[in-house]
């Protein structure tokens, strides 16, 4: 989003039309995959609930889309004007560091004591994006769940995913 937003207005519109438009000169992308919080492609690492070391926010009261309000969210809105039927999948690269066993965004895993809170993080994300006019059509519990070497990243084995999903599903009810 940051790179696309750095283009001139004309070049940006040309690119967005070429990618998401429906005319003969467009490739008509119909499905996007975006990160929940930062990915390894972002200029800086962030979650939507960053806290100082030692603090926790079980109910996600400090949750905020602020890190993406400058680039990603405005860009998604522009894409939706071009293609209002586009489907969006959202996937995290890491839980907020305070939820992880090593308290950092690199590697490690989600601490089981925070499964319920992390499920609420997903719910808050879907709700917050909806208030921005962006519908998230699908989610995944973790990007590259067995690769924990990027910044951000998080190991989430199949067994961990099963345990977490058992909390995630009911959180959406």
Predicted region positions:
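Alpha/beta-hydrolase-fold catalytic nucleophile elbow
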Residues: 91, 142-143
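Active-site-proximal beta-alpha loop/turn segments in soluble metabolic enzymes
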Residues: 100-111, 143-156
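N-terminal catalytic cores of secreted or lumenal carbohydrate-active enzymes
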Residues: 1-136, 162, 166
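Gly/Pro-rich turn-and-neighbor structural signature
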Residues: 150-173
